[in-house]
Amino acid sequence: MLTGLFFGSFNPMHIGHLALANYLTEYTPIGQLWFVPSPLNPLKNTQELLPYDLRCELIEQAIRKDIRFQVLRIEELLPSPHYTIRTLRALSMLYPHHRFALLIGADNWQSFDRWKDHHRLMAKYELIIYPRFGYEVDDTTLPTGCRYIHDAPRIEISSTQIRTSILEGKDLRYWLPLPESQDVIASALQSCLSPKR
């Protein structure tokens, strides 16, 4: 069985993440999909980064009744920086009988040649590229082992937009997998943004 690895900050998870995960397990060879939250992304604003445990718990609650999905907290156990190749090596040692596919958005595919050891990633693991608004992928030029999933759903919601809207007091109950999590996220964001003493 092919196991898809969905990396990201999930800051917070939203319905777009779940719609994509559902599509990939129903319309591609992926039988299981593991969410791999990143403790820290050096390219993103850490001031609004929700606590790692909270992000993982929100994902776990959202997927708790779906056996196709699970959360992997492996990156908190690995040294920084959290390069994808290091995480995949660790997973391959922990789960030697699994076949892994790396799921990446078309936006990340555009800069994939700048990823650490990207040639090794492509040589050892399947890459499944999903569409993102504003980014085109020419699947006729993709290397062997890479595939572009044209029909995967694109829901134009971002975690950044969710955080901003929650801080503005907007009602986002239909954007989040768990409507009741909005208050928890709002409280955590206020803590993140309050001056540290």
UniProtKB/Swiss-Prot annotation:
SUPFAM superfamilies per the UniProt record, alphabetical: Nucleotidylyl transferase
One Gene Ontology term of the molecular function aspect: ATP binding
The broad enzyme category this protein falls into is: transferase
One biological process term from GO is: NAD biosynthetic process
Record EC number: 2.7.7.18
Matching CDD domains, A to Z? NMNAT
Give me the reactions it catalyses.
Answer: nicotinate beta-D-ribonucleotide + ATP + H(+) = deamido-NAD(+) + diphosphate
- InterPro entries from the UniProt entry: Cyt_trans-like, NadD/NMNAT, Rossmann-like_a/b/a_fold
Keywords, in A-Z order: ATP-binding, NAD, Nucleotide-binding, Nucleotidyltransferase, Pyridine nucleotide biosynthesis, Transferase
Q: Which family does it belong to?
A: Belongs to the NadD family.
Question: What function is annotated for this protein?
Answer: Catalyzes the reversible adenylation of nicotinate mononucleotide (NaMN) to nicotinic acid adenine dinucleotide (NaAD).
Q: What is this protein called?
A: Probable nicotinate-nucleotide adenylyltransferase
List the source organism.
Porphyromonas gingivalis (strain ATCC BAA-308 / W83)
Gene coding for it: nadD
